[in-house]
Amino acid sequence: MATTFRSQTLSKDDVNYRMHFRMINEQQVEDITIQFFYKPHTISLLTVTVLSLMYFAFTRDDGDPDSNLRVGLILLVSFFLVISVLAFPNGPFTRPHPAIWRIVFGLSVLYFLFLVFIIFLNWDQVKALMFWLDPNLRYAKREADVMEYAVNCHVITWERILSHFDIFAFSHFWGWGMKALLIRSYGLCWTISITWELTELFFMHLLPNFAECWWDQVILDILLCNGGGIWLGMTVCRFLEMRTYHWASIKDIHSTTGKIKRAVLQFTPASWTYVRWLDPKSSLQRVMGVYLFMIIWQLTELNTFFLKHIFVFPACHALSWCRILFIGIITAPTVRQYYAYLTDTQCKRVGTQCWVFGAIAFLEALACIKFGQDLFSKTQILYVILWLVCLAFITFLCLYVMVWYAENYGPRQKSFSECEDSIYSEAGDSVTECKGEFEIDSTTSCSTRKRRDSGDSRTINGMEK
């Protein structure tokens, strides 16, 4: 019986789908100038890995069981990250190097697996693990047990107000500056800021440290710290949007100062994408997607406070601030991938980093619920329902205002192609502005035009060729 082989030809839609998904999940570096840093060195890496493993396995003293366990875990994480560099996708970013973002994705996978492991332990085992990591946690106390909140709110003095400008106020300001760089929308940033204060009110019966004086919550938090950070972040966004990005090869720069400057600029975005979460023609699915984005954002913020309250470690402990920094780093590619999924009709699935981030958020919440059953048994269901309703109302109101403003006062023709990436998209070493209403089909023509135009300029990013 003859066997018939049929050649399967991908349709144009399939090709576009794969191209669009690859742009956010496996961004490629274009116009590579120093081949050594981007060529695979798998054999060399394997050799170094095996030799280092042999060295640590046979030269160290294995008489201390505790030290054996710590060193073993450290090497396990290290070699998993080596595999991450070899096998995991780049994600949407390529600056300063794709390997950095593969390691970030590898760390997020490790944290996800760690949360899965934690969920299947009992409370005594979790506490024993925490005490093994840091014996000083045996003496840690909840902040709610040693501090008072929202006391004497009618007493308003300059001394009391100035006393609130501490390291946490600075972290609020700086944190909102970074959030604005990620979200790039005044409307969404202000909505998240306001709804978070409402979230604190609705969950105050569970977490006493959510209780704040009205002037602390409204003036210091919303207006000064959050508002100042949003303004700073959006100002930086506008500045980066107006720049024209032409990247010169470091080989074409002859001065030592120019080479050093180009090397430093490798740690800056390759381009900056104009972001528009909603427009007058947005579908209901897109609106609901933004609402889901708000819910997950609030859930991630809530996890920060519930984790340190249930597992009893202070805000200044390494477990707290390391998690905050880590979540902040993986949020960057997550938001980029979710934005592409939400706004690009050709992108039919979320990126892998976005998927892992969502799983982490829900696993953290699940761990809090499992090990904080005494706390959550006091939950007022009515408050939670009202919180969801208020969050939905404020979100939809904000979205309506954003669409109305864009329709009446927004730019008519201004838009940029999403063929590059930065904190949102980086397409490589040669970038510029491309006209169009987020039409990724024009990516090829835009990139060709950019490379042709960049060749006519003798000065690139302030460096003479």
UniProtKB/Swiss-Prot annotation:
Its EC number is 2.7.8.29. This is Phosphatidylserine synthase 1. Residues 446-465 are annotated as: Disordered. Residues 57-70, 124-286, 331-355, 402-465 are lumenal. It is found in: Endoplasmic reticulum membrane. Its main location: endoplasmic reticulum. GO terms for molecular function: L-serine-phosphatidylcholine phosphatidyltransferase activity; L-serine-phosphatidylethanolamine phosphatidyltransferase activity. InterPro entries: PSS (IPR004277). The chain crosses the membrane at residues 36-56, 71-91, 103-123, 287-307, 310-330, 356-376, 381-401. It comes from Danio rerio (Zebrafish). Keywords: Endoplasmic reticulum, Lipid biosynthesis, Lipid metabolism, Membrane, Phospholipid biosynthesis, Phospholipid metabolism, Transferase, Transmembrane, Transmembrane helix.
